Amino acid sequence: LIAAAVAIACLAASGGLSTVYAADTKEKQQQVEQQFRHLYRTIGEKSSTKIKLISGPEAIKMRNGRVPGKRWFATSGQFKFKLTIQDGVDLKVEKLIERLEKLPLPYVRAYEVVSDEKEDGIAVYKSLGGASAHGGKQYINIIPGAGPMVLAHEVGHTLEQKAKESDPEILDKWEAAIEADKVSISNYGDQVRHEDLGEFSKVYAACLDAGEAQLSKLRKLSPARFKLWESILNDGDLSAEDSEVLPRTKN
């Protein structure tokens, strides 16, 4: 009990979730991710995302550790972005593209966000110190074995940080959405609010790929997060009708 209290206190001090779901609650037993996990196995089967290489490979020094690698430029729809693979990694760029194409086209915007002049786009490293991936405004780094659901989670971090440029309160709004929904997404998401957002991004990607029936189910289970994530995903393009359902942040 003491350890649990300390953990909760640490979460609060670090800006973590203000709502902590006890292990024996109904919400915890019916976490949102558990209801859609079966979709992860088939994600991409209905994807219309197509990626085309337009140049490369070019020998470069990658951002993380200045290790040698190869870089390509690619396009998908209206998006243009970079693909970078560390030398010696057992992953062909064609296989990387197959993996990236499994995510719905709106998620490709994150690939472009991390492809500014001094950035590497989607970057594949031999190792990330034990992690499968890292995502932020300037990078999406993955290891060779990271699958599409890992990518979908990291896209959440990238687009959240991009949205924060125009809306510094975006994570406060997300926390308000968590409290309004009163449901846990996953154990990992319960740790801190930005990981909750990453986990929701992952679930939403699977539902978007699966079709309207699954999207509607997700919308009913977590309506506040759903509306806010669609705004983040579509670069703030949210209808007035949808904006009315978003929770207000506390003053």
Stretches with model-predicted labels:
Residues A123, N141, E160, D196-S201:
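Structural recognition of the beta-strand scaffold that forms the well-ordered cores
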Residues G145, A163-S186:
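Post-HEXXH active-site segment of zinc metalloproteases
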Residues A3-S14:
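Bacterial N-terminal signal peptides
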Residues E175-P247:
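Metalloprotease/metallohydrolase-associated module, dominated by Zn2+-dependent proteases
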Residues D90-I97, G145-V150, Y188-V192, R219-K220:
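Soluble non-cytosolic domains of exported or imported proteins
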Residues M149-K164, G198:
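Active-site recognition of the HExxH zinc-binding catalytic motif
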Residues Q35-K137, P144:
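Auxiliary, metal-adjacent structural segments of Zn-dependent hydrolase domains
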Residues V20-A22:
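Boundary at the C-terminal end of the N-terminal hydrophobic targeting segment
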